Regions:
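AAA+ P-loop ATPase mechanoenzymes
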Residues: 1-195, 199
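C-terminal alpha-helical "lid" subdomain
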Residues: 352, 356-411
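Conserved catalytic/switch belt of AAA+ P-loop NTPases
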Residues: 267-268, 283-331, 337
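AAA+/P-loop NTPase substrate/partner-engagement loops
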Residues: 240-273, 281-285
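Walker A/P-loop nucleotide-binding motif
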Residues: 197, 214-234
Length: 411
């Protein structure tokens, strides 16, 4: 059996890593192998389709990488076990199947375009075209497969550090259309860019560390004035601990009713998740209020052990209150009880962290720090004068205002 037919048989029998056959490049390559006995038009169509994909992905000279890297982002029993550091608990026959699959992936990755063309049943009919057909270069495999000798240590270490499935490729997600969707270009903000609010950030960081380490931790409400860095803190923390198995999923506040669906999708995953709800507030009779209350109180749709809820709000009390809410009527003798019920939701977050607008000195310290980070060549006096004028035009001082001012210096 030549290498091409052997490869076709091995790919046909993939088991643990069978999911890679749904990925575009391996799927197109397999379809090419299946067309080896078909008419020239069908074979050449499959060949051209694969070459087109490789060119579009910048892999025309990295065929081996394009094939093997799909295994790094596959979601299977071995990848999940390795992510949790429990691959040693897998049955021996599963481990053996993983090794066989890895051999199959490597066999496919090493095949050259010349070998495939030579194996075509009707090669004589296209011999005049073969010299001008595009050819791929094999190149090197993905690092975990480079020099594979039967040991799964490199692959296990990769999953342990990066996670499995789409959670290995992406670190930030959003709940949309009833499913978890990756965020292709997340905010890259990190902890080193912050100035001020050290006490508030340390509270959230310490709570997150306890969560990652499996210690006692709390759902967290970050509340206070707009533009003070509440959302940025959550995003920066998610970036800071991504290599510790932490992922962030943003849940739009108008989809809180979907919380049980989200729980079902992440509960069994060997990763930690922050469920992020931004700009949280409710109107009376809001069904989402009841859903979140049940989650925080530990109802049937309670959050799993591998998830925490981090919410931000401009309000300490999350249910908007109107004058009419304070008006007693004959029909409603429990107005006070209803008000207390509405105002108590925020108390169900175990950790509440307050962000207030900075003082003038704190505001200017933030400006100076950001200006230094960006390499601005201005004196503190010049920065202070410009920043204060900018803040007046923006309705007040805040970290957001400070950042916008520094950015405006480059416009």
């Amino acid at each position: 059996m030549n290498n091409v037919n052997k490869c076709k048989m091995l790919l046909s029998s993939l088991s643990v890593f069978r999911g890679i056959m749904n990925r575009s490049v391996p799927k197109a390559f397999y379809e090419l192998l299946l067309s080896l006995d078909k008419k020239p038009e069908e074979f050449l169509c499959a060949y051209g389709k694969l070459c087109s994909m490789l060119c579009e992905r910048g892999c025309a000279d990295k065929f081996a990488f394009a094939i093997s890297e799909t295994a790094l982002f596959d979601d299977n029993c071995f990848a999940r076990a390795a992510t949790a550091g429990r691959q040693g608990e897998l049955p021996e026959n599963v481990v053996s199947a993983v090794k066989t699959d890895c051999d199959a992936i490597l066999t496919a990755a090493k095949l050259t375009s010349d070998e495939v063309l030579e194996a075509y049943t009707y090669a004589d009919e296209i011999k005049e075209l073969i010299p001008i057909l595009p050819k791929w270069q094999t190149g090197k495999c993905a690092p975990c497969f480079d020099g594979f000798d039967g040991s799964l240590d490199k692959l296990s270490a990769y999953y342990k550090e990066n996670g499995c499935g789409m959670f290995a490729r992406y670190k930030a997600f959003i709940w949309r259309d009833g499913d978890i969707r990756p965020v292709e270009h997340p905010d890259r903000i990190d902890m080193d860019t912050f100035t001020g609010y050290e006490r508030q950030r340390s509270q959230v960081v310490n709570n997150t560390l306890s969560f990652i380490q499996g210690k006692s931790c709390n759902n967290c409400l970050l509340y206070g004035d707009k533009g003070t860095g509440k959302s940025s803190t959550v995003k920066a923390i998610a970036n800071e601990f991504r290599k510790d198995g932490l992922r962030i999923v943003e849940m739009p506040k108008d989809r809180l009713i979907d919380f049980p669906l989200l729980v079902d999708k992440i509960a069994a995953l060997p990763l930690k998740f922050i469920i992020f709800i931004d700009d949280l507030s409710f109107q009376h009779q809001d069904q989402s209020y009841t859903t979140l209350k049940a989650v925080l109180e530990g109802g049937l749709a309670a959050r799993p052990d591998n998830a925490l809820i981090y919410a931000t709000s401009n309000r300490r009390h999350l249910v908007k209150e109107s004058i009419s809410d304070r008006t007693h009527t004959v029909d409603d003798i429990n107005v006070r009880d209803n008000m207390q019920e509405s105002l108590s939701l925020s108390d169900r977050f175990g950790l509440a962290v307050c962000y207030t607008i900075p003082s003038k000195n704190d505001f200017l310290e933030i400006v100076y720090s950001l200006a230094e980070q960006r390499g601005v060549k201005m004196t503190h006096e010049e920065l202070a004068l410009g920043a204060e004028q900018f803040a007046l035009s923006r309705g007040g001082r805040s970290p957001r205002c400070a950042r916008q001012y520094v950015e405006s210096l480059f416009c």
